């Protein structure tokens, strides 16, 4: 299939995590949340990735990183004190019972899992904002202890002050932010999700190691034309040169038809075809899982917005690192809140997959003889 890269007018490099709130969540109520904060400009201020293999990868905190961890661990006590002070001042009962379930410091961002044990008088955002302010205060305090020549070498600082002056940073602006504006949160919504969150946190250093040492297969290209369609693409772009087989398990398939169809998809992969699809239904995901486990290739159509900092999740991440996956997306904007894929989007992705594979429709396969 013909494909080429076009100049793409959109630039996602500076996208932040601002306003990624769920419109359906009560952020002052009881709940568990995975929060993510990124340093302004994604500067690696918080630590350094160490280790000589994915299994041994870990992050060694910088001095600032240790202060961030200290501020994180202080959240429950600080919020209890603030609630007690407000109760005395307003003659009301204020509860801010918070438990920290885990965290992971990375060079340019921070993940934490926070448990609001009972309804609070303030939303989660105020708790996170207090944590961010505490970290920023520590950051500015550290800046003031560093001489001008050292700071002028910092990639995040721009100054017109002469290099040869010996004044301290007390005379310099400390308004340069530590964190980018806003943060991302993911509420726990189903049973078993907490363990997934914790595993994701602990897996972050390994994932960073894999991505740094497999930069080619995580390469993001914008404006990749496939037939009449234009996509943003991440992964093994060479997969576009290979014959494809569309995967779309129809609802109308009977049990035998579905099994025959899924087997036919795996057979196509074993014959060298790249499986292409949205892989939305559980049956389509089963086909993808078997194909990846056997070492075959997959082109995943997604509604995710692909940015320079995007990383595929779950089995797709490791498969992408092995060169088995290409992600394609036509998403051009960042939603103001998390949402699920719509039925119309599902239909569009399935149609695109069939067009890429060179077919107009997929007929149910004949069931195997009984």
Regions of interest found by a model, annotated:
Residues 1-228:
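Short catalytic/metal-binding and nucleic-acid-binding patches
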